[in-house]
């Protein structure tokens, strides 16, 4: 069946029907479509389009359709144009002629906006719950090694020593922002579009506020033309998905490196790795590589809808049907990646000796030395030059920080008094970084406790 056709002398061609149909993918909206139509039936009763008996008959039929739609058999042989048409056809089969009234004063333009908004707000909540789990795993792993020291990197070169929990808390902060981003996306989606009609507003005095309350929306949209041409709420959701995937990809990249033989910091669990069909020794970080790979796919989902929307005239255009596949795909890939990340974190263990040795044998203490000189009264630019020459001399002599004695340091530069030798130990320099947000031991312990407390307050 079609929800249109009187103006046409013949039906659509077979090629066009195949090309334009969306049931294969928008069927995921069926539960939202049914709930929205049930609320709309109540609104139609309130304006006298449906009697109480007719409304009850329609709502009961929708309940039956909703239950049956859980089975794949429900869709077998369906050739409907989209999920809305399928639902109306099924309604007619159960409720008869009264089903013809359900679309009174309603357009598929607002209906698909409603369905998508409902789906996105629920999916946003689900993804927040998965982010919550990842953040909890990060804190668990941080608490296992509260005093472990690792080199921090800039430009993929050893830069300064940091505590392992400080590093993990950096990702906690990223994922916390992601958690809030999905909350923002849900809030922006959570306004009712019903009553907007195709673009000019419904011709019936529907109680939009009552429908909003019935469906759990926080309010109603304010402009019917905006509703018809709007997919900002979908872009907001896709942006949240994309940024989260980028954060997951960065974590994956780090851990692919840190678990390699060259680093040897991390041991990934057998359950999240795979082997080689040829090389018996291999233990490959496939889970992390797939997360990294899927991030590009999700970036593409956002890009595709941005490009689709960029040149559309007001208001609705059929191009906007192309929002569903990127939305669904981004949500699926992110959900799978979050579950995988949580499993990876849970299975991973740190070998503290390896990153500690990497920190001790490199010049991650250089900034500590320069800042200590500055605290002792040497202008920082001069201190920077002194330490730079000291590092250069060490490189030429193939000396590690621990190879220097206090006497040799003082002989190299009189500004290096005997107490400076202690700063050649990375742990010593971190004592000066007891600042909120810094990597000092007490600061990190406080940050870890705060993160745990904050996680407990998040509403999922």
From Swiss-Prot:
Entry-linked Pfam families: ASL_C2, Lyase_1
Pathway of action: Amino-acid biosynthesis; L-arginine biosynthesis; L-arginine from L-ornithine and carbamoyl phosphate: step 3/3
Entry superkingdom: Bacteria
This enzyme's EC code(s): 4.3.2.1
Keywords: Amino-acid biosynthesis, Arginine biosynthesis, Cytoplasm, Lyase
Keyword Amino-acid biosynthesis in record: yes
SUPFAM superfamilies: L-aspartase-like (SSF48557)
Compartments it resides in: Cytoplasm
UniProt keyword Lyase present: yes
Catalytic activity: 2-(N(omega)-L-arginino)succinate = fumarate + L-arginine
InterPro entries linked to this entry: Arg_succ_lyase_C (IPR029419), Argininosuccinate_lyase (IPR009049), Fumarase/histidase_N (IPR024083), Fumarate_lyase_CS (IPR020557), Fumarate_lyase_fam (IPR000362), Fumarate_lyase_N (IPR022761), L-Aspartase-like (IPR008948)
BP terms from Gene Ontology: arginine biosynthetic process via ornithine; L-arginine biosynthetic process
GO molecular function: argininosuccinate lyase activity
A GO term from the CC aspect: cytosol
Similarity comment: Belongs to the lyase 1 family. Argininosuccinate lyase subfamily.
PANTHER family: ARGININOSUCCINATE LYASE
Protein name, per record: Argininosuccinate lyase
Lineage: Bacteria, Pseudomonadati, Acidobacteriota, Terriglobia, Bryobacterales
Gene behind this protein: argH
């Amino acid at each position: 069946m079609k929800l249109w056709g009187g103006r046409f002398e013949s039906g659509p061609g077979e090629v066009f029907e195949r090309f334009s149909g969306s049931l294969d993918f928008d069927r995921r909206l069926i539960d939202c479509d049914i709930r929205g139509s049930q609320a709309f039936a109540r609104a139609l009763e309130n304006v006298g389009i449906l009697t109480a008996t007719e409304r009850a008959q329609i709502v009961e039929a929708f309940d039956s359709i909703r239950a049956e739609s859980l089975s794949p058999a429900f869709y077998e042989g369906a050739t409907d144009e989209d999920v809305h048409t399928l639902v109306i056809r099924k309604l007619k089969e159960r409720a008869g002629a009264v089903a013809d009234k359900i679309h009174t004063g309603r357009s598929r333009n607002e209906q698909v906006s409603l369905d998508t908004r409902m789906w996105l707000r629920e999916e946003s909540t689900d993804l927040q719950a998965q982010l919550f789990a990842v953040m909890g795993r990060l804190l668990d792993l941080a608490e296992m090694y509260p005093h472990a020291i690792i080199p921090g990197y800039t430009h993929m070169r050893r830069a300064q020593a940091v505590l392992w929990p400080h590093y993990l808390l950096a990702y906690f902060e990223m994922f916390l922002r992601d958690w809030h981003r999905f909350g923002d996306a849900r809030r922006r989606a959570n306004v009712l579009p019903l009553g907007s009609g195709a673009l000019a507003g419904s011709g019936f005095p529907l109680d939009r506020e009552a429908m909003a309350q019935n469906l759990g929306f926080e309010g109603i949209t304010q402009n019917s033309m905006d509703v018809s041409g709007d997919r900002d709420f979908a872009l907001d959701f896709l942006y949240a998905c994309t940024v989260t995937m980028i954060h997951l990809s960065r974590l994956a990249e780090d851990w692919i490196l840190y678990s390699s033989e060259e680093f040897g910091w991390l041991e990934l669990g057998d359950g999240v790795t795979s082997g080689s069909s040829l090389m018996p020794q291999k233990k490959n970080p496939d889970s992390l590589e797939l997360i990294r790979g899927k991030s590009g796919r999700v970036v593409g989902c956002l890009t595709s809808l941005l490009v689709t929307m960029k040149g559309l005239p007001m208001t609705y255009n059929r191009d906007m049907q192309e929002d569903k596949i990127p939305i669904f795909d981004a949500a699926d890939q992110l959900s799978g990646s979050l579950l995988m990340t949580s499993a990876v974190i849970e299975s991973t263990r740190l070998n503290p000796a390896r990153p500690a040795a990497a920190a001790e044998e490199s010049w991650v203490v250089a900034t500590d030395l320069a800042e200590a000189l500055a605290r002792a009264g040497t202008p920082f630019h001069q201190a920077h030059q002194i330490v730079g020459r000291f590092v250069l001399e060490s490189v030429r002599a193939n000396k590690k920080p621990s190879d220097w004695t206090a006497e040799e340091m003082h002989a190299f530069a009189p500004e290096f008094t005997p107490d400076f030798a202690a700063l050649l130990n990375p742990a010593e320099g971190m004592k000066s970084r007891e600042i909120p947000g810094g990597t000092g031991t007490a600061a990190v312990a406080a940050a870890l406790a705060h993160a745990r407390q904050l996680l407990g307050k998040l509403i999922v």
